[in-house]
Amino acid sequence: MFKNSKKKITLGISVQKFESKPNNWKTLIYQRHTITIEELVNLICEGHCICQNFKTASKTFGLREKTIANFDFADCIVLDIDDTFLSMNDFYLSLKDEHKPTIIYTTYSNIDNINNRFRLIYVFNEPIRSNEYYRGIANTIVYNIQKEIEGFDLKDKTCLNSSQQFAGNGNDNIVYYYNDNIDVLIFSRYIMAVVYLPNVIN
């Protein structure tokens, strides 16, 4: 990781904001924004949802356009951690510094030490331009977590694809964030070694 407080990333931000997890994801409308990490944290805390960047004809887009086939690029990778045996704080402290996420925040359904649910965002220093590469880096992140947290399993495998969307948390959330950007080479150099592991890919 390296410090860069002026680093900006581009991603889809929902026009709507929510006080609880959206009931109907099909109604969400997104617009592409280029923002700082701190601005992203503020939008998450306001209850906005986020997604990656897609090739669209208009400034706003929805579920129809948000597909793997339309994927344009990603400046970050987002992973859902559901029903893990560690609280968000303990999970974070268990990771080596080079594998810690840029942003980590609890989801709407999190109940500490009962139903631990949170989200990891890894901001990279260069864009990811294919779903295959996105999955490769995401799987490598999971692989490194599994090496450092014995018994960890990524239960929601849908977040390994670039087409996934993620809720913010505008209600009693806990957020850690750092103005650190991760060198994509830290993870990409291991892709060929782990991308075919059956216990990681689903």
How would you describe each model-predicted region?
Residues I103-T106, I191-N202:
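Long, charged low-complexity interaction segments
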Residues E148-S162, Y196-N202:
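Short secondary-structure transition/capping segments
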